[in-house]
Amino acid sequence: MTSKSWIRWLGAPLIALVLTIAPPVHAVEDARKVSVVSFGLFGDQGVFRSEATGAAQVVAGRFGSGPIDVQYNSKKGGGATIEALAKSLQVAANGLDTENDILFLILTSHGSPAGLAVKAGRLTQTLTPSNLADMLARTGVRHKVVIISACYSGVFIPLLANPDLLVITAADANHPSFGCEDKAKWTYFGDAFFNIALRQARSLKDAFVVARALVKKRELREHFEPSNPLMAGGANVEPLLIVRP
């Protein structure tokens, strides 16, 4: 189904209420820098490579005024490991004004109640909520956005979300998400949030509201139990990202 078909199918009233055709979104007028780090962690399926790359491009196009770091794994190997993620976050942080700029992290993979699966060739790891919370704290960057596209990704919210850290997840802590086919370009959530809603919405919140409705509609049509995407925290972060007049 194309993006236009998705929007027609969801229905005009909700789209008219939430989604507007907008000029590019940028940081506020004081030239706030937004640095994007995007990791496709599970190498056995190409959808995570595609989604990590595509999501970073969309976010940078809507918000970007800083560097982009995209890493992913394949069946043969790759550098998107837990250690590499910690290093990439620190490198990104070193180029930011820690009080004023924004660190934007995107993670896409399979997930479980324990965390996110990392698979690079024969290497297997689990990125836990406590692992990620520690990494983010060590960056010293105040304002952060974390978007996690994975099953059970809501498990990350309790340890991550706070007024300075906005967290968006593809599912709650008790449900899988869908669309992890090897040759797909996007997961269901990635398609709805990054590929459709965020390209047009005026804010992350608006994009999330539309994406959540799109995902639920698709899941019900395909007889899946809804994954219940979540958004939490970020009261001090989201206002810093606005549409430039």
Residue positions per predicted region:
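N-terminal secretory signal peptides that target proteins for export/translocation
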Residues: 1-6
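Bacterial N-terminal signal peptides
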Residues: 10-21
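Boundary/activation segment at the start of structured domains
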Residues: 23-100, 179, 184-187, 242-245
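Loop/turn elements at helix/coil->beta-strand transitions in domains of secreted/extracellular proteins
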Residues: 31-35, 64-68, 98-103, 140-145, ...
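Extracytoplasmic/secreted cell-surface and envelope-processing proteins
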Residues: 45-49, 78-82, 113-119, 154-158, ...
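Active-site microenvironments of hydrolase-like enzyme catalytic domains
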Residues: 92-121, 144, 150-176
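A short, glycine/acidic-enriched catalytic loop
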Residues: 109-139
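Active-site-proximal C-terminal subdomain of hydrolase catalytic domains
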Residues: 150-238
